[in-house]
Amino acid sequence: MDPQAFVDAVREDNKTPLSRLGASKALYADTEGEMDDETVLAAAGDRAHHAAETLSAWADDESDEAAADLFADLAETERDHAETVASEHGDYEPGDPPAVQAHLRTVEGTVERLGALVGWALAAGNNADQVVGYFVGQASPMTASTFREVSGDYDDHVEETSEALATVCESDDDWERAREAAGATITADYEDYFETLEALGVNPKPVC
């Protein structure tokens, strides 16, 4: 398997969760129904802040030098994202870790962590796109433009991480472990979305 085939497989495996995590209800779940500028920014900040903490911890205990460098680089990008939120929302203070970060902190192994990161970045990019859409709707083009750049960073994360996988996956079994880790990460994000909306009395499934 090559990097693009891996990403395509993860997308196909998780088509429904990724689609729903890229819909407006996902942002509603992230903010627990509080759809105002400060709450949307705070939710985005929490995702970035806690992702940076997870990635920094991985960089510190990773034995593969190239993977450790990648984790450190991605952590720095996520810190930049959190600082972007702070510049837009002057009173921002980090809240509790999102469920997907709690899941990622249980993942062990270089192959598994890289696979999990692909899943995380695919879902995170969808989330950033929803933040863009929110601020477009709020007639805040500068903030929307800022989050378009954030979304683009997640596209880069997917590419860089899948390419890193190609250097550590030595067998089909390795690729399969990475694929399962990606799916489990998307599932963790999706289950939190589903449970949060149900608790808010909202149907998590699209109404046809």
Task: Show where each model-derived region lies.
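Non-heme di-metal
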Residues: D2-C208
